[in-house]
Structure formats: C-alpha cells, structure tokens
C-alpha cells in the first residue's frame, strides 16, 4: 500500500489535495488544518493512510505521523468514520484531543459541528485508555508505524482490505501469499482484483 507521497501540490478542494508525483496526480483527502498548511506549486511529503473498498481506493494524507495515528484512533470510536475523523482533526490538534480526553472534557468535542453529546461521551470513554499511553516513542506509536509499513510480500493492510470484502483472515492470507508467489511484481490494485476474481471463480 502507499505509505507516503512526495510531490508538488497541483490543486486543492474543500477536503482534498491533488499531489503530482512524477506526472501522476494523486487525490488525497486531508483535514482542514493540513490543507491550510499546503500551498499550490510547493513540494511536500505526506504520510498516507490507504483505505481499500470494492468500489474505491481512498488516500488520506497527513503532514506528521501524530495526526495519522489520531486519525486511526478516532475511527476506533463507535460512530466515527473517515469523514468525521478528518472533520474532528480539522478543529482539534492531536494534542487538543489528548488533553480533552485525559481531562474528560466532553464540551471540547460537543463544540464541533456534527458531534453530539452521546458521540462526545463515547470519544472520551473509548479513547481514555488509548490516549493515555501515547507519548513520544511510546509502544503505540511504534506499533502504528509498523502496521502500515510497505513490504514486497502480503501486508497487514492488504489482508485487512480483503477481510473487509468478505474473506476470512485465513482465506485472505493464503490468497495474497499465493498470488504474490506467482507474481512478485504485481501491483496492489491487481493483487486485490485477482484475489476477488479467484475467490468468485471458486463459488
């Protein structure tokens, strides 16, 4: 999976940026805070979170790993998806979120449009233990860095994507390993498509 993009900002929208990498334009969704720091024509390095679904592949970009980690943490809360996670990160920095959760300050989250009292309470309750462990060099940060590491063999993210598409974890692991053994240079897109095609042909 794509873990990082380095390129020139070609264009920006309300919730996305197009990064030109060697003539290829990647549409990357980002928080308002991140977009506000980008300027067209300038070069940047963005850390990327890739979400794969049967109908699309979405890229989410971050200028620092801390924001990427909190993007994933927020999605661990029941009721928060990618769009809401970015919306919250457009209003609050990771440090703001950490302080609010540790202080059990629900009002910080309730002040964000679209976040009601129940969701604010869930954010505090469900992130309390996780956020408390986050600090520079903590085990959580190290684990998060490893999860999205790009390897030439089956990555956890590819397997997770196939599980989201209906595979059991065992099926996904076997499918990915088998395809890569036959074609080590296969692209991620083709890997997923081939796995889906092979599975459908077996039914």
Curated annotation (Swiss-Prot):
One of its GO terms (cellular component) is Holliday junction helicase complex. Residues 64-142 are annotated as: Domain II. Keywords: Cytoplasm, DNA damage, DNA recombination, DNA repair, DNA-binding. HAMAP family: DNA_HJ_migration_RuvA (MF_00031). One of its GO terms (molecular function) is four-way junction DNA binding. It is found in: Cytoplasm. Residues 143-149 are annotated as: Flexible linker. Residues 150-203 are annotated as: Domain III. GO terms for biological process: DNA recombination; DNA repair. CDD domains: UBA_RuvA_C. Has three domains with a flexible linker between the domains II and III and assumes an 'L' shape. Domain III is highly mobile and contacts RuvB. It holds the Pfam family RuvA_N. It comes from Rickettsia africae (strain ESF-5). InterPro entries: DNA_helicase_Holl-junc_RuvA_I, NA-bd_OB-fold, RuvA, RuvA_2-like, RuvA_C, RuvA_C_sf. Residues 1-63 are annotated as: Domain I. The keyword DNA repair applies. Homotetramer. Forms an RuvA(8)-RuvB(12)-Holliday junction (HJ) complex. HJ DNA is sandwiched between 2 RuvA tetramers; dsDNA enters through RuvA and exits via RuvB. An RuvB hexamer assembles on each DNA strand where it exits the tetramer. Each RuvB hexamer is contacted by two RuvA subunits (via domain III) on 2 adjacent RuvB subunits; this complex drives branch migration. In the full resolvosome a probable DNA-RuvA(4)-RuvB(12)-RuvC(2) complex forms which resolves the HJ. It comes from the Bacteria. The RuvA-RuvB-RuvC complex processes Holliday junction (HJ) DNA during genetic recombination and DNA repair, while the RuvA-RuvB complex plays an important role in the rescue of blocked DNA replication forks via replication fork reversal (RFR). RuvA specifically binds to HJ cruciform DNA, conferring on it an open structure. The RuvB hexamer acts as an ATP-dependent pump, pulling dsDNA into and through the RuvAB complex. HJ branch migration allows RuvC to scan DNA until it finds its consensus sequence, where it cleaves and resolves the cruciform DNA. Belongs to the RuvA family. This is Holliday junction branch migration complex subunit RuvA.
